[in-house]
């Protein structure tokens, strides 16, 4: 799928706003500027007539890093409109609680706990906080029938508490009577088990108590339903918890691990490659006030959707112009003893990258960042150009060079009325490194920009 861009909308007014934003960022980072570089000023920006080639690669749930967990969504601040969230990964946000020995001797858990269930792992292992059951269901050694039944009853009570707190009833579990919130002593107890683990436990529980496993339990994969749908009496949609294994196979859900971050050299060596989180209370249920707010309003149909698009961008241009003015300072025998005016003009570049646009409908905002293209998506000619820019045939480790391998400049050192040095190679190379480094530090994931969108009744993609 491709996008049609109206390149004429990039007018002088938008260019001026971009320049103001860039110059404010430069003023804020003036202390990081080298001592031999004077004040930097971006004076002119022209996007040119060469528009990029943009294509949609995937549309998925929002990455957890983009979700605004520090403030409630608009519907909780008074706007009566909701957007259902995915349950593929659960983000529990709750006050810090202390747990005793009956929770495995765990002291305190973080305010926010990310829990991911991995169906590819053995069914008796769960990746998450220690307060989630991670021991073998069958035990580490042989058990008598009575001991096996006792272990099954213990796990039955634990999972019954967790499922009942979410209003979920599973086959073979008995009644799903809601328990008081005081009985749900751990925030992570509201997290449903993964399908593989729950099915294994259910079969073992049936085997320990009755000596056989019902056929319906073996074939059942729908172990978790949305609490709101069960509350309404309908069967409800299948929870995305049972589809984690399918979603995890999609490369579009994972931040790229190539380049600097794959080697553990970036600011975030280990990134969470999960789907969007869902916000739930300790008990896993909405309060009565939130239930009333969750009623769909007439304007909810026109609300901005919550989704994430991955775009592929290829932008070769020779008409782009960006004028930069600064000065070279000579700090001997004293500071700023001599100053040489320096004017740089970017006259063209070659850019290829992935663009992540995450629309957060509940907060009316958009998150934008750049990512490196995957190895199988990159053009061999583009890779060779990046290798030439790096000066070696080795695998590139710099995201800035991968995204922006070619930059052309016109430079002038001095003043027109006096002596002028043109096209100074070392100065141009230094400025190119500064631009690539700035691009990597500002826009390349895990760095991103958040844009507050104006409230409107209708939005179109």
Swiss-Prot record:
PROSITE patterns attached to this UniProt entry: SMP
Compositional bias per record (Polar residues), positions renumbered to this chain: 80-97, 272-288
InterPro entries listed in its UniProt record: Mdm12, MMM1_dom, SMP_LBD
Protein localization: Mitochondrion outer membrane; Endoplasmic reticulum membrane
Domain of life: Eukaryota
Membrane topology of the entry: Peripheral membrane protein
Assembly with partners or alone: Component of the ER-mitochondria encounter structure (ERMES) or MDM complex, composed of MMM1, MDM10, MDM12 and MDM34. A MMM1 homodimer associates with one molecule of MDM12 on each side in a pairwise head-to-tail manner, and the SMP-LTD domains of MMM1 and MDM12 generate a continuous hydrophobic tunnel for phospholipid trafficking.
PANTHER family: MITOCHONDRIAL DISTRIBUTION AND MORPHOLOGY PROTEIN 12 (PTHR28204:SF1)
GO cellular component, one term: endoplasmic reticulum membrane
One of the GO biological process terms: mitochondrial genome maintenance
Pfam families named among the record's database cross-references: MMM1 (PF10296)
Annotated segments matching region Disordered: 75-104, 226-301
Protein name per the record: Mitochondrial distribution and morphology protein 12
Keywords annotated in UniProt: Endoplasmic reticulum, Lipid transport, Lipid-binding, Membrane, Mitochondrion, Mitochondrion outer membrane, Transport
Record family assignment: Belongs to the MDM12 family.
Main localization category: mitochondrion
Domain called SMP-LTD: residue spans: 1-454
UniProt entry tagged with the keyword Transport: yes
Organism annotation: Mycosarcoma maydis
Reported function: Component of the ERMES/MDM complex, which serves as a molecular tether to connect the endoplasmic reticulum (ER) and mitochondria. Components of this complex are involved in the control of mitochondrial shape and protein biogenesis, and function in nonvesicular lipid trafficking between the ER and mitochondria. MDM12 is required for the interaction of the ER-resident membrane protein MMM1 and the outer mitochondrial membrane-resident beta-barrel protein MDM10.
Molecular function terms from GO: lipid binding
Domains (record comment): The SMP-LTD domain is a barrel-like domain that can bind various types of glycerophospholipids in its interior and mediate their transfer between two adjacent bilayers.
Signal sequence range: none
């Amino acid at each position: 799928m491709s996008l049609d861009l109206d390149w004429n909308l990039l007018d002088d007014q938008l260019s001026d706003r971009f320049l103001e934003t860039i110059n404010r960022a430069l003023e804020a980072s003036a202390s990081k500027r080298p001592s031999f570089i004077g004040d930097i000023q971006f004076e002119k920006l022209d996007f040119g007539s060469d528009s990029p080639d943009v294509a949609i690669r995937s549309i998925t749930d929002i990455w957890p890093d983009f979700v605004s967990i520090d403030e409630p969504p608009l519907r909780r601040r008074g706007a009566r409109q909701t957007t259902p969230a995915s349950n593929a990964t659960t983000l529990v946000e709750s006050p810090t609680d202390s747990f005793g020995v009956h929770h495995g001797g765990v002291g305190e858990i973080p305010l926010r706990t990310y829990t991911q269930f991995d169906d590819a792992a053995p069914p008796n292992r769960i990746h998450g906080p220690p307060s989630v059951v991670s021991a073998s269901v069958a035990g580490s050694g042989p058990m008598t029938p009575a001991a096996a039944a006792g272990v099954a009853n213990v796990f039955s009570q634990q999972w019954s508490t967790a499922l009942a707190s979410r209003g979920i009833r599973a086959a073979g579990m008995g009644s799903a009577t809601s328990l008081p919130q005081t009985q749900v002593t751990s925030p992570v107890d509201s997290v449903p088990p993964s399908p593989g683990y729950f099915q294994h436990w259910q079969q073992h529980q049936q085997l320990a108590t009755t000596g056989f496993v019902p056929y319906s339990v073996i074939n059942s994969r729908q172990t978790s339903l949305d609490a709101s749908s069960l509350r309404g009496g309908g069967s409800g949609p299948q929870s995305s918890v049972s589809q984690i294994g399918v979603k995890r196979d999609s490369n579009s859900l994972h931040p790229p691990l190539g380049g600097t971050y794959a080697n553990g050299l970036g600011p975030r060596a280990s990134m969470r490659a999960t789907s969007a989180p869902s916000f739930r209370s300790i008990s896993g249920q909405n309060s009565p006030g939130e239930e009333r707010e969750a009623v769909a309003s007439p304007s909810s149909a026109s609300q901005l959707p919550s989704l994430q698009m991955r775009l592929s961008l290829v932008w070769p241009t020779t008409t782009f112009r960006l004028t930069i003015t600064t000065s070279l300072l000579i700090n001997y025998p004293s500071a700023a003893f001599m100053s040489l005016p320096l004017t740089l003009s970017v006259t063209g570049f070659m850019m290829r990258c992935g663009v992540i646009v995450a629309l957060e409908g509940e907060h009316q905002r958009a998150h934008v960042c750049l990512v490196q293209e995957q190895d199988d998506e990159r053009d061999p000619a583009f890779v060779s150009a990046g290798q030439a820019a790096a000066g070696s045939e080795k695998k590139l480790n710099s995201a800035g060079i991968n995204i922006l391998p070619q930059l052309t400049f016109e430079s002038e050192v001095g003043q027109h009325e006096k002596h002028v040095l043109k096209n100074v190679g070392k100065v141009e190379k230094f400025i190119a490194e500064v631009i690539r480094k700035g691009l990597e530090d500002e826009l390349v994931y895990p760095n991103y920009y958040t844009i507050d969108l104006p409230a409107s009744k209708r939005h179109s993609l």
